[in-house]
Amino acid sequence: MMNWDRIEGKWKQLKGQAQQQWGDLTDDDLDRVDGKREELVGVVQERYGLAKDEAEKQVQQFESSCNC
């Protein structure tokens, strides 16, 4: 979670990376997230029909792989 402050601060630049990882997310979804980690977990969970812990795991992978 230590990178999340940086991710939140650079969300506009990182939205493209998020959309590459989760191609089903719309621009509206990503705007709604607005850099908020819990919101991203919720949107990923909703769009992909995942359990919360699986969505959380995917967001952690994004967090550790993003260039931030």
UniProtKB/Swiss-Prot annotation:
InterPro entries: CsbD, UPF0337_stress_rsp, YjbJ, YjbJ_sf. It comes from the Bacteria. Pfam families: CsbD. Belongs to the UPF0337 (CsbD) family. This is UPF0337 protein RB10934. The lineage of its organism: Bacteria, Pseudomonadati, Planctomycetota, Planctomycetia, Pirellulales.
